[in-house]
From Swiss-Prot:
Molecular function (Gene Ontology), one example: RNA binding
Taxonomic lineage of the native organism: Viruses, Riboviria, Orthornavirae, Negarnaviricota, Polyploviricotina
Keyword tags: RNA-binding, Transport, Viral movement protein
Entry protein name: Movement protein
Stated family: Belongs to the tenuiviruses pc4 protein family.
Gene Ontology terms: biological process: transport of virus in host, cell to cell
The keyword Thylakoid is annotated on this UniProt entry: no
Job description of the protein: Transports viral genome to neighboring plant cells directly through plasmosdesmata, without any budding. The movement protein allows efficient cell to cell propagation, by bypassing the host cell wall barrier.
Pfam families, alphabetized: Tenui_NS4
Length: 283
């Protein structure tokens, strides 16, 4: 009889852990974090630049929100790292699939406008970043288009520009980018991302280019986001490109071209005469 009472079911109160709701949330969050770290034992929680861009809200990007009717837009992205106090040189988006696409559909075109968004990951580093874009399609260095932009290393910035030259598929290795770091307070690598947005203007040969319209400018000093709050970067790329591409075709004056500024565009493209006048045989 005693054994029956001992093993019989009881209607008494069930004992539970008196953990509060907030404490339970903290426990669940800690457990989820441990699971994520254990799932990636090699990285120990470190993120690749693609993963970091996703966390920061920089990916994915779509041109669906960009209202541009006169131009066909092509996009590409490049990731690179550069040692502090060093110079890195690479070509602009030399991916053959990306570069070949506009040249396949539009045999004759020029780069009318492009936007470049430079995203620096080293938020607390001091020093300057100098970015040069050089078109080495010409044999004579005096004819090469060269643009130079200087900005603090820990800043994000966007640049719009226009090149007056025709491009061919063979020119894909002639658009060079040189990035240098000066006066940096770091010794390790500075990882960055460059997003290129090309505006393709379709033309027919022979057509003279309006070289007077060739200009490179920093369209807007971007806000100094707090890098400790990832939510601040929500739709960052979309907002930047929408302002850049949408406002570039209506803006007439560029106060950023003031040479007295410490940062910004410090060197403009040289005005290159595309169609030189023919000399008469009687001269």
């Amino acid at each position: 009889m005693a054994l029956m009472k001992l093993f019989s079911r009881s209607n008494g109160k069930v004992l539970v852990d008196d953990l509060s709701e907030e404490g339970q949330k903290r426990l669940d969050l800690a457990n989820n974090k441990k699971k994520l770290l254990s799932a990636r034992p090699l990285t120990k929680g470190r993120m690749s630049i693609d993963q970091a861009a996703t966390v920061l809200g920089l990916e994915p990007f779509s041109f669906a929100d960009i209202k541009v009717n006169k131009y066909d837009m092509f996009t590409a992205k490049q990731d690179y790292s550069i040692k502090a106090n060093r110079v890195a040189t690479f070509c602009i988006a030399v991916d053959p699939f990306w570069f070949h696409k506009p040249l396949t559909y539009y045999p004759f075109f020029r780069i009318a406008t492009f936007a470049m968004v430079w995203i620096g990951v080293k938020g607390r580093a001091a020093g300057t970043t100098t970015l040069k874009i050089i078109d080495k399609s010409y044999v004579d260095p005096q004819d090469q288009v060269e643009v130079e932009v200087t900005y603090p290393i820990c800043k994000n910035f966007a640049v719009l520009g226009s090149l007056p030259n025709f491009l061919a598929l063979e020119d894909k290795t002639n658009l060079r980018v040189s990035v240098s770091i000066q006066g940096a307070t770091v010794q390790n690598c500075v990882i960055s991302r460059a997003l290129w947005f090309w505006g393709i203007e379709r033309t027919d040969l022979p057509v003279s280019m309006k070289t007077t319209d060739t200009v490179m400018f920093e369209f807007e000093p971007l806000e100094d986001f707090n890098v400790n709050h990832l939510s601040s970067f929500s739709k960052f790329t979309t907002n930047v490109v929408q302002k850049a591409v949408g406002g570039a075709f209506v803006t007439k004056s560029f106060p950023e071209l003031d040479s007295q500024k410490e940062f910004g565009v410090v060197k403009q493209p040289k005005k290159i005469p595309i169609m030189k006048p023919k000399r008469s045989i009687f001269d």
